[in-house]
Amino acid sequence: MELISLKYAIFVIALLVLYYCFPKKYRWYVLLAGSMAYYVIICKWYVLFIIFTICTTYGSTIWIDKLLKKQNAIVKSHKEDWDRQTRKEYKEKGRKKRVAVMLFALLCNFGILAFLKYIPYAGELGLLLPLGISFYTFQSMGYVMDVYREIVEPEKNFLKVALFVSFFPQIIQGPIAIYDKLANQLYEGHSLRLLNLQKGALLVLWGVMKKLVIADRAVNIINFVMDKPMDFSGTYVFFAAVVYALQLYADFSGGIDIVRGIAEMFGITMSTNFNHPYFSRSLTEYWHRWHMTLGDWCRNYIFYPLSISKRFLNFGKWLKPRFGAHISKVLPGCIASVITFIVIGVWHGANMKYLYFGLWNGIVIMLAELFAPVNKKVAGGFFKLTGLREKGIFATIVSVLWTFMLILVGYYFDIAANASTAFHMLFKSVTDFHIGELGINNIILNLGACGLDEYDILLLIICTLLWFFISFVEENKKLDMRDFILSRKLPLRWAIIYLGIFIVIIFGYYGPGVNPADFVYMQF
């Protein structure tokens, strides 16, 4: 049951009807039944993996809570006869017990994920990667860690925990939800509101447009060049990398738009996963705009715990008298950042190329932080000398283009078959680049065998420019295009909606002879 298919549309509509027909207090049962049914339909017996995650998530959070309450009760009962040191020692013993329970849940779930994703023997045993396992594992283990940290109260209802872990729209490719932002929305039972249906449907339409019109058309160029990248000039290797940046963004954000739109029809607001990332002026800013829920998860559960740990704080103190205040303040956080990006890289796959992907991003950000004072002085001198404004149009364009080039280097490791090929592709892109080869006629001549003709290339360019124009307006005017459309008079509103449907039907890349491309992040 593909995300963009008639079967899935019928499933969602049927579930919507059932959801709003039931009394409010029972509506979450409909979501749970629909979510589990959906997972069984698409994954068959692999549903056992998500059931295991549900059970360990529920059991560990309840256990942690019981240990904490028992500890607090005993400490309270000995308020008069225990001194401060005794209370401290007892609490430390209790904390270690709770850590053990948390680690048990983490090791069980991340262990299964690692075995299925990174150990070759899993494939030999006939075990495939269960759909969405990375996403629901990260989400549920984040909840376990939040309970341990006493950020949230554990949910006592097993079925409600099951719904939080398995909510069907996000199971394929996220977004990765934080418990206290999503859980209550799932359980409360929402009223039927026309505005939710309208805004959700518009977001779904927008996601389908990005996927079918742009992403599935662009993927032909990428597959064609990456099949034998050394047979092409550096110009077309670079061109394929740029197209990949476009295709990945259209594919992933399109899928997330569909997911968020469906959730919104049920009255549920899911976290934003993209915020116009290619308008970023630095790599750090990019990672705050791209795959935002994964970035938030890694910051909350890897970066911050590392950077404020005793070992890292002591390292900072050791650095201060030797290298000065700036290095002592920044370097520990930079090392934590590099470790975090290594985890992000490895999350994408077991191939060494993903390790290099993580290292590239982490090291570039680390160098930017370490040399920030120097960069600031150089930039300040440049702007003073030229009379240009630091936040003017010229500076913004240069910053955005430079950041995009840094992003693009990372993508070489993503699209190449392996790390060695990625390095060869990078070298070729620098030493064998000829801008004259980027004319449409030359592109058709050299890449025509990929299955796209001049019409497809022009359509890809026009639709991409339209997409980025809309994104530019949203970015600069702080405008939600859906609110803009729904605020228009009825004839214009429907004209825009019908135009979107027309674009999908007429210009969508599907039909006889076309192999539909899966969403990229389904594989994770």
Q: What residue ranges belong to the model's regions?
A:
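Membrane-embedded transmembrane alpha-helical bundles that form the catalytic cores
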Residues: 1-523
